[in-house]
Amino acid sequence: MQIFVKTLTGKTITLEVESSDTIDNVKAKIQDKEGIPPDQQRLIFAGKQLEDGRTLADYNIQKESTLHLVLRLRGGMQIFVKTLTGKTITLEVESSDTIDNVKAKIQDKEGIPPDQQRLIFAGKQLEDGRTLADYNIQKESTLHLVLRLRGGMQIFVKTLTGKTITLEVESSDTIDNVKAKIQDKEGIPPDQQRLIFAGKQLEDGRTLADYNIQKESTLHLVLRLRGGF
């Protein structure tokens, strides 16, 4: 069948393809016609960036569909994600991609829902709203993918301003760990945080399980006064 590829300059390229062709194949055909290396090509259809290993049929691209070709920003790069089984996944990313974006790409490739993914880099768990640049993750960096234990859960932390923060935690996390997660999200040093649950102030060395804090529990965050004791 024929499909069309429209570039940002407005030029339209016509390609002969099969439904079973992969996005890699299509990029190779574009290289043949236009001389643009595949690693500089990003193909968009129906608002979605197309992943190399998938086929046209996977994206329901039919005859006379129009794809959009965007040249990859210089910030484009490959990173690797290693699973506990030892498998390594290669992802095409931008420095400005959020951890959410990366988890979505992993879902596209591996079928693992984002809420079951924990990504680790340099020993640190990566928070969804942050970007690769925030963590200084550069080209060919390797992230580690850990599947979230069944003990993994969300809890909420409500501040005196009324803002509610959502945290991903394990029952075995200590109050110290929780304060560190709050610092990552909100920038509040742990020594200025007091956490309250069921009217009780939580002690740093104890775990969430110790206080019977379960999924979707709400903690209250009170800022410690300077000089307070």
From Swiss-Prot:
Note: Ubiquitin is encoded by 16 different genes. Ubiquitin is generally synthesized as a polyubiquitin precursor with tandem head to tail repeats. Often, there is one to three additional amino acids after the last repeat, removed in the mature protein. Alternatively, ubiquitin extension protein is synthesized as a single copy of ubiquitin fused to a ribosomal protein (either eL40 or eS31) or to a ubiquitin-related protein (either RUB1 or RUB2). Following translation, extension protein is cleaved from ubiquitin.
Species for this entry: Arabidopsis thaliana
Record's protein name: Polyubiquitin 11
GO biological process: ubiquitin-dependent protein catabolic process
Keywords on record: Cytoplasm, Isopeptide bond, Nucleus, Repeat, Ubl conjugation pathway
Gene: UBQ11
InterPro entries: Ubiquitin-like_dom, Ubiquitin-like_domsf, Ubiquitin_CS, Ubiquitin_dom, Ubiquitin_ubiquitin-like
Compartments, as annotated in UniProt: Cytoplasm; Nucleus
Proregion span(s): 229
Function: Ubiquitin exists either covalently attached to another protein, or free (unanchored). When covalently bound, it is conjugated to target proteins via an isopeptide bond either as a monomer (monoubiquitin), a polymer linked via different Lys residues of the ubiquitin (polyubiquitin chains) or a linear polymer linked via the initiator Met of the ubiquitin (linear polyubiquitin chains).
Presence of the UniProt keyword Glycosyltransferase in the record: no
Gene3D superfamilies: Phosphatidylinositol 3-kinase Catalytic Subunit, Chain A, domain 1
Any single GO CC term annotated in Swiss-Prot or TrEMBL for this entry: cytosol
Family, per entry: Belongs to the ubiquitin family.
SUPFAM superfamilies per record: Ubiquitin-like
Annotated ranges, domain Ubiquitin-like: 1-76, 77-152, 153-228
Sites of the Glycyl lysine isopeptide (Gly-Lys) (interchain with K-? in acceptor proteins) crosslink: 76
Nucleus as UniProt keyword: yes
GO molecular function annotation: mRNA binding
Major localisation: cytoplasm
Pfam families: ubiquitin (PF00240)
